[in-house]
Amino acid sequence: MTHPLDRPIWSALTTRQADIAERVGSAVRLKPDYGVFAAAADASERSRIALNYLDHGPEGLWLVEIDEVEPPPGLLVVHHTAPCVQMVADHVEAPKSAFTIERLGEADAADMFELARLTKPGPFFEHTNRMGNFIGIREKGRLVAMAGERLRPEGFTEVSGVCTHPDFRGYGCASDLMRITAARILARGETPFLHSYADNTGAIALYEKLGFRLRSQMTLTVLVREGAEGAPVIGHG
């Protein structure tokens, strides 16, 4: 039986997060205002062809699997691939943070979107903040750091959207927010996990220090319509 984290997008969007997904036959994707992630039911040509009929948007479809996804016959071609790592944590202690940590909600959505666009922590769209719980740090009313939850397969929750304004890096904001987020996931009886680009060695070292360990090598495949102009924005892992 396939482990849920071997196919995190399919596992999440066909179970706990099916309400924010769009499905066409054997293919599924996040609704475009939530994100760009998509998956086919399996690696068969029949399942992959269904990817052609999803809404591709200007950013294309982002698939995260153990192996690179072969483009289906038809409209889609590979625009970009990147090796990634998937990490999980079995124990994380929430820090006694020197910062005032706030829970972020709909009233903070515009500030969250602005910070994500500035820092590029990965794909972040109008309603990405609704995918799970987010927390943040404000300085004189300005949101300067945040972290939250994204994909939620059964028994697991992804830590994502971690970013800090350039003027406030080096103070430990991101590590505190990540530890708090991961500890709260564990307290719910779930396992926190995350993804990073494999060449982002600095980030991976930080994640290991926080209590995460390597679970699997993964591959990001970005599929776009043949002949599409421009490139999707690839954020930091």
Residue locations for each model-derived region?
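Conserved beta-strand-loop-alpha-helix junction that forms the acyl-donor binding cleft
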Residues: V64-V69, F193-I204, L220-A231
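Acyl-donor-binding surface of acyltransferase catalytic domains
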Residues: T2-K96
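Short amphipathic alpha-helix that is part of the acyltransferase structural core
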Residues: T2-D6, D90-G122, V233-G237
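Conserved acetyl-CoA-binding loop-helix of GNAT-fold acetyltransferases
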Residues: R46-N52, T164, G170-A187, I204-K209
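Conserved catalytic-core motifs of GNAT/GCN5-like acyltransferases
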Residues: V77-A89, R213-G230
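A short, internal acetyl-CoA/4′-phosphopantetheine-binding micro-motif in the GNAT/acyltransferase core
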Residues: F37-A41, V162-R169, Y197
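A conserved beta-strand-loop-helix scaffold within acyl/acetyltransferase catalytic domains
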Residues: P123-H165
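Conserved active-site alpha-helix within GNAT-family acetyltransferase domains
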Residues: V69-L76, S175, A198-S216
